[in-house]
A protein has these predicted regions:
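Terminal targeting signals and extreme-terminal segments of soluble enzymes
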Residues: 1-134
Length: 134
């Protein structure tokens, strides 16, 4: 599979990710990495990166890793733990790790960190294969 082409396709087709500012910077088999430049609009009332922003990054990162196997997927389940507030953060990075690749279900752990490598959130996400080639 041409992972660079897949990365470009995912960035082009994911309109919500584009709106949210999430860029997929790397995809390889069972792995993806995304980045986000934090804007004031992404902060909650206490000045921390909004949890929905962290969740969006985790879902896009996990989903991008899941499609690395060549089939379309949809999110089946997600669980996230917010570990630290993202205060005075300029950039976020999320990385996925494949936990299970089954015939129908794929499971990933995603870590979201700030530019100082501080771990802000950890998510476990399951994706259902739609058994449709990309």
């Amino acid at each position: 599979m041409d992972y660079e082409k897949l990365r470009e396709l995912r960035n082009k087709q994911n309109r919500f990710g584009d709106l949210a500012g999430v860029r997929i910077v790397e995809i390889r088999e069972g792995y993806a990495r995304t980045e986000l430049e934090v804007k004031p609009e992404f902060l909650n009332p206490i000045g921390s990166v909004h949890g929905g922003c962290l969740f969006t990054m985790a879902d896009i990162t996990g989903g991008s890793a899941a499609v690395s196997h060549g089939e379309q997927v949809t999110t089946a389940d997600a669980d996230i733990r917010y570990l630290r507030p993202g205060i005075n953060v300029k950039k976020l990075t999320a990385e996925s790790r494949e936990i299970k690749k089954g015939k129908n279900l794929l499971v990933y752990q995603v870590e979201v960190r700030d530019e100082k490598e501080t771990l802000l959130a950890v998510a476990t996400l399951s994706y259902m294969s739609l058994h449709q080639k990309i």
